[in-house]
Amino acid sequence: MIQMQTVLNVADNSGAKKVACIKVLGGSKRRYAGVGDVIVVAVKEAMPNSKVKKGDVMKAVIVRTAKEVRRQDGSYLKFDDNSAVLISNQMEPIGTRIFGPVARELRARQFMKIISLAPEVL
């Protein structure tokens, strides 16, 4: 469950380390975002000589949340951290590698490139 001002880890090699959510996309008064939702983020920490710089405003898709996600079969899935993958305006990932597991809910949201790059899909 991600809202404005939430700081997330970045789970790709785009060069950003930490990002802060500045807007949840989808609806004028939408407050929370979960796994698979697209948000607007500001880069708070970045590696030197990387594709993204500190202060850049980008879109990102949430791949892991500490708040549990309820599945259709009644099971729950939660992770140790809140993480996102930076994406372009064409909804393609900016990085070429994904670190750590990602949730299966991304498949229903048509983020197949992220699913194929991820080392593990839970």
Curated annotation (Swiss-Prot):
Coiled coil: none
Gene3D superfamilies: Ribosomal protein L14 (2.40.150.20)
Superkingdom: Bacteria
Pfam families associated with the record: Ribosomal_L14 (PF00238)
Gene Ontology cellular component annotations, sorted alphabetically: cytosolic large ribosomal subunit
Keywords: Ribonucleoprotein, Ribosomal protein, RNA-binding, rRNA-binding
Record field: transmembrane: none
GO BP of this protein: translation
Annotated GO MF terms: large ribosomal subunit rRNA binding; structural constituent of ribosome
Task of the protein: Binds to 23S rRNA. Forms part of two intersubunit bridges in the 70S ribosome.
Subunit relationships: Part of the 50S ribosomal subunit. Forms a cluster with proteins L3 and L19. In the 70S ribosome, L14 and L19 interact and together make contacts with the 16S rRNA in bridges B5 and B8.
Family as reported in the entry's similarity comment: Belongs to the universal ribosomal protein uL14 family.
Protein name (Swiss-Prot/TrEMBL): Large ribosomal subunit protein uL14
Organism: Syntrophus aciditrophicus (strain SB)
Organism lineage string: Bacteria, Pseudomonadati, Thermodesulfobacteriota, Syntrophia, Syntrophales
